[in-house]
């Protein structure tokens, strides 16, 4: 029996799709990422200030102890969220984002926390939470992840990680994250990626009035 050659290619389709999913975000030059749409210049400046503050910590690592300066900065927040002093051994992604907000002078619109889920709750209380599929974030927004693959394909579970949106380009989002593989570094994800739990949206416009 003669098998048409095109049917022999079918097993390769999942591999090709997986390769596109994994490698495509990593092929976009960093300078391409930016604002998906225009915002007032004063708001743009505030958002850029937070992003620049976070990105200045790129390369900070646990193994050489350089992340401790970020933890120390977070622990100067008064009062400390939950009254808890973060240790150098704790997961520090949320502390990273909160320390960046402190350094940028934006704690009045960005709720500080060392817990991803408690920070989500704080954004929700401020009515600054968004989890609709297709949301287009801006630089300076907070992106929360849930790494547990959702059985219903609707990511509404427990958030294990958070980062700060650096910018978007087409279907991609570039993020600066603390405690990404134990250091501070960039991640590029697909907009609508299954692992995105939602976004905390600081009210930058309120500081520009």
Model-derived segments and spans:
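Terminal low-complexity, poorly structured segments
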Residues: 8-13, 69, 76, 118, ...
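Short, Lys/Arg-rich N-terminal segment immediately upstream of the first membrane anchor
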Residues: 1-5
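N-terminal capping segments
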Residues: 24-106
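...with weaker cross-activation on analogous glycine-rich loops/strands in unrelated enzymes
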Residues: 107-182
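Aromatic- and glycine-rich peptidoglycan recognition patches
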Residues: 7-10, 14-44, 149, 153-209
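Solvent-exposed, flexible loop/coil residues
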Residues: 74-78, 124-130, 184, 193
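The N-terminal extracellular segments of secreted preproproteins, especially immediately downstream
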Residues: 92, 113-115, 194, 207
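Intrinsic disorder/low-complexity signature
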Residues: 59-64, 69-72, 114, 138, ...
């Amino acid at each position: 029996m003669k098998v048409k050659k095109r049917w022999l290619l079918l097993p390769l389709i999942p591999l090709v799709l997986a390769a596109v999913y994994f490698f495509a975000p990593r092929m976009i030059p960093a300078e391409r990422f930016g604002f998906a749409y225009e915002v007032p210049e004063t708001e743009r400046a505030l958002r850029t200030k937070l992003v620049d503050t976070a990105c200045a910590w790129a390369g900070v690592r646990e193994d050489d102890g350089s992340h401790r300066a970020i933890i120390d900065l977070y622990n100067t927040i008064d009062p400390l969220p939950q009254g808890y002093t973060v240790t150098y051994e704790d997961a520090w992604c949320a502390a990273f984002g909160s320390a960046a907000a402190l350094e940028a002078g934006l704690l009045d619109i960005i709720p500080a926390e060392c817990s991803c889920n408690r920070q989500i709750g704080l954004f929700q209380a401020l009515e600054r939470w968004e989890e609709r599929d297709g949301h287009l974030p801006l630089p300076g927004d907070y992106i929360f992840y849930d790494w547990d693959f959702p059985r219903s394909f609707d990511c509404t579970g427990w958030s294990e990680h958070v980062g700060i949106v650096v910018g978007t380009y087409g279907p991609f989002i570039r993020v600066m994250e603390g405690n990404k593989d134990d250091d501070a570094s960039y991640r590029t994800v697909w907009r609508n990626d299954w692992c995105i739990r939602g976004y905390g949206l600081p009210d930058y416009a309120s500081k520009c009035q």
